[in-house]
């Protein structure tokens, strides 16, 4: 950093100019960083990059807040999550993202084998389930899935199954020109 201020009485630091905070296998880089060692809080502004080399993921945004003690955190303004723990990187782009991964407004998730869009998304690492709300659409190898809510279950970052709830529709292009297979129901399970 080129400009920093530290208060040893309060254990608070402010770093200005392009700066980096390193904590074990995690780093936060940003144009301005604020660190409260007593409360174990970090906040970054401007082109923030949070990297966790142990879990092989990265978060990029313009505003980041993270509390190490509670695990609560959020990222706003052009948030982009990258999970490179598997051979194929998973990208999730959204306006805002929260620690349990709550992504809001204009969510896009993509990698080579699957793409998805929706208004809101919740990802739980406990059951490896990604739940998409409000006009969700999932594309996978020439197939399009639509519904009111879509639950995508993963196994080691590989899509295993999707549950489409409410006005479920699957559209798949046939080999022939302009012909499609279509299935519609109240609820549908799709296996990959």
Describe the residue ranges of each PLM region.
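Structural signature for solvent-exposed beta-strand/loop edge elements and short helix-capping sites
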Residues: 1-192
């Amino acid at each position: 950093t080129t400009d920093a201020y530290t208060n040893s009485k309060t254990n608070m630091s402010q770093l200005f100019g392009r700066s980096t905070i390193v904590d074990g296998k995690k780093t936060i880089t940003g144009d301005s960083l604020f660190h409260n060692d007593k409360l174990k809080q970090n906040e970054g502004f401007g082109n923030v990059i949070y990297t966790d080399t142990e879990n092989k993921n990265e978060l990029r945004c313009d505003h980041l807040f993270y509390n190490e003690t509670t695990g609560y955190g959020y990222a706003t303004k052009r948030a982009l999550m990258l999970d490179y723990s598997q051979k194929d990187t998973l990208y999730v782009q959204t306006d805002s993202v929260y620690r349990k991964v709550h992504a809001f407004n204009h969510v896009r998730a993509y990698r080579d084998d699957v793409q998805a869009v929706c208004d809101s998304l919740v990802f739980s690492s406990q059951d490896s389930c990604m739940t998409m709300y409000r006009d969700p659409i999932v594309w996978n190898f020439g197939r399009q899935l639509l519904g009111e809510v879509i639950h995508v279950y993963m196994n080691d970052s590989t899509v295993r199954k999707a549950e489409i709830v409410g006005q479920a529709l699957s559209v798949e292009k046939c080999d022939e020109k302009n012909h499609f297979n279509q299935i519609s129901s109240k609820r549908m399970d799709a296996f990959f």
